């Protein structure tokens, strides 16, 4: 579990002063955690001893150990496929690649599904509120996962948009964002500045931000209303997108159940409209 994840999970248990530290840390994570004790205390409008009590409560012997853990997270966040090649090359040649990867995929999905459980009710309520527009956004690779969610949702309900066409046109999508609209954004490590800036702009327009990210947390987590964390590591030079796709399947299943006859009627209408375009009977 990342420090950010731990702080989020324990937020309700902190004292008032510790909660100010937690919010300051989450608001500019991980860089706030790399500041001096004095500077973080000023950011949180509290004292140095409160900062030290806060990191002790997280399980660290001292502030230096706390910062070492954050450095390790940052290093893991920024790993490129080229770096991961070295670790993959050390695996036993006798080990079965299919088994190792399949086991990792199963484990990742189980962990992410458990994390989603606490928020699935809220996510379902948001995605099935027909008074809200839903925007789906992803990055260079995660854009395909955003498109996957979009393809499902547009059959279930009106008012769903996929943010695409290149960043030069992204402002056009922001133009009509209203308070309460939803941005479902997929952002995984080697996070993209353009995706972050779009999310910030949507949040500034009071959109609800639902973030699907990895266990190291995209910077978008600091402005998100709901965060779903997906393990993505597998025995490969590349991170896996399967867990993100599985979260889309789970969210879609929840939406289907919640919308019930309304989505069924919409799909029936769509199927009738498609008939003239189908080659097969």
Language-model features, listed with the residues they occupy:
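A short, charged, Gly/Pro-tolerant segment at domain boundaries
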Residues: 261-281
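Glycine-rich phosphate-binding loops that contact phosphosugars or nucleotide phosphates
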Residues: 125-259
